């Protein structure tokens, strides 16, 4: 069967369900698909189709995630759901499935639980801009006061982690009842989708952001000059644009005198394109893999930062033993490894495989860096962890 043509008429948004184990994330995902399918806006998915999540690899880490897609009146959504708690942590820290917003599922029967808190904290750390709340299992609670109490707790928790707890939409419903076709609860799912449409901001398109391209390779064309190749991460680059070479040394400005893709000359190239950029005045020795080319003054080089990291378990191919303060692995940013020293938070003696922790890092060379930049932690060429920059120090 031929693949369906991707409809670009509606703006696209990436979303995901987060929340404590057994609070109904996967049931809600199935209920959204089923409810929207009845209106011709999605393909119906059974619970077990979503629950049997395929394995994916991101930054050397295996993660189980299910992807479903659906449309609302205004948008096209790609929705990610993870079966296990560890998969969520890994997914959010590695940015395997980027989230422009999240649906936090909280069971009214339990209220906020430890993983509810952890997922909200992680969402804040990795830069998820907005959260919409679905209070699930409301059909199992007879006392309206309990529902009000749970709602209050959730709002307080969101505010604690810098989300707008007072104005966050909280929809009360039952994912299971909606999945079983109860019209009252299907309406609640539609209410949730409207809240997502209205409250979760559309992401800025990559092409609207300032230009950045990590350098993968460099070579010389006799008589023409030096060419840097790579995949454009964001923005647009045009002939005669000025760009800065940043990282692993002094920042230098060049002018683009040629843009080439698949051996064809172009006037410009944009996010997602694999290109060669001819740089006026550059010498091959000046440019190495791991540097970036970027719009002037759009990003700066740094060596010291804080990060939220996940440390792989032995079964995931990670370390067999904990690491202590002063551990010196390689940090793999974009296209290269840079050695750095890890300082652990006060009171933390060591970090055990499987832990999530906030660390302070000093790199031996500067890297073009900004908040939410993802990286892998490697030791002798194998991945032992992954993380996201949460704060730049210098």
Curated annotation (Swiss-Prot):
InterPro entries: EF-Tu_GTP-bd, EF-Tu_GTPase, EFTu-like_2, EFTU_2, G_TR_CS, P-loop_NTPase, Small_GTP-bd, T_Tr_GTP-bd_dom
Residue sites binding Mg(2+) per the record: 26
Catalytic activity: GTP + H2O = GDP + phosphate + H(+)
UniProt-annotated binding residues for GTP: 19-26, 81-85, 136-139
CDD domains per record: EF_Tu, EFTU_II, EFTU_III
Region described as G3: 81-84
Region (G4) residue spans: 136-139
A GO CC annotation given for this chain: cytosol
Annotated region described as G5, given as residue ranges: 174-176
Major place of residence: cytoplasm
GO MF annotation terms: GTP binding; GTPase activity; translation elongation factor activity
Localization (cell): Cytoplasm
Enzyme superclass (EC): hydrolase
Chain ranges of the tr-type G domain: 10-204
Region G1, residue ranges: 19-26
Protein family: Belongs to the TRAFAC class translation factor GTPase superfamily. Classic translation factor GTPase family. EF-Tu/EF-1A subfamily.
Quaternary structure note: Monomer.
Name assigned to this protein: Elongation factor Tu
Species name: Fibrobacter succinogenes (strain ATCC 19169 / S85)
Gene, per the UniProt record: tuf1
């Amino acid at each position: 069967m031929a693949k369906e043509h991707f409809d670009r008429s509606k703006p696209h948004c990436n979303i995901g369900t987060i929340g404590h184990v057994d609070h109904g994330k996967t049931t809600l995902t199935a209920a959204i698909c089923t409810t929207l399918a009845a209106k011709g806006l999605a393909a119906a998915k059974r619970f077990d189709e979503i629950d049997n999540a395929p394995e994916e690899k991101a930054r050397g880490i295996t993660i189980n995630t299910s992807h479903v897609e659906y449309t609302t009146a205004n948008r096209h959504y790609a929705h990610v759901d993870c079966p296990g708690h560890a998969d969520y942590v890994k997914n959010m820290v590695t940015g395997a499935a980027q989230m422009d917003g999240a649906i936090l599922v909280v069971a009214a029967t339990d209220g906020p639980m430890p993983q509810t808190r952890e997922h909200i904290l992680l969402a804040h750390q990795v830069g998820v801009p907005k959260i919409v709340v679905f209070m699930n299992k409301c059909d199992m609670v007879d006392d309206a006061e309990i529902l009000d109490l749970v709602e209050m707790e959730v709002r307080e928790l969101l505010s604690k982690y810098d989300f707008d707890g007072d104005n966050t939409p909280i929809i009360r419903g039952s994912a299971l009842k909606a999945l079983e076709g109860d019209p009252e609860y299907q309406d609640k799912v539609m209410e949730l989708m409207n809240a997502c449409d209205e409250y979760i901001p559309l992401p800025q398109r990559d092409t609207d952001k300032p230009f950045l391209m990590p350098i993968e390779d460099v070579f010389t064309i006799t008589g023409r000059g030096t060419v840097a190749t790579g995949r454009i991460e964001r923005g647009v680059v045009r002939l005669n644009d000025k760009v800065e070479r940043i990282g692993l040394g002094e920042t230098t400005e060049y002018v683009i005198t040629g843009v080439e893709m698949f051996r064809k000359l172009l006037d410009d190239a944009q996010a997602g394109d694999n290109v060669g950029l001819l740089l006026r005045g550059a010498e091959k020795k000046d440019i190495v893999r791991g540097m970036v080319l970027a719009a002037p003054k759009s990003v700066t080089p740094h060596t010291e930062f804080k990060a939220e990291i996940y440390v792989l378990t032995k079964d995931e191919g990670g370390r067999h033993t904990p690491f202590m303060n002063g551990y010196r692995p390689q940090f793999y940013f974009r296209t290269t490894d840079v050695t750095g020293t890890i300082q652990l938070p006060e009171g933390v003696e060591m970090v055990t495989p499987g832990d999530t922790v906030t660390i302070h890092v000093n790199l031996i060379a500067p890297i073009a860096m900004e908040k939410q930049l993802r990286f892998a932690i490697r030791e002798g060429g194998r991945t032992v962890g992954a993380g996201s920059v949460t704060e730049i120090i210098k």
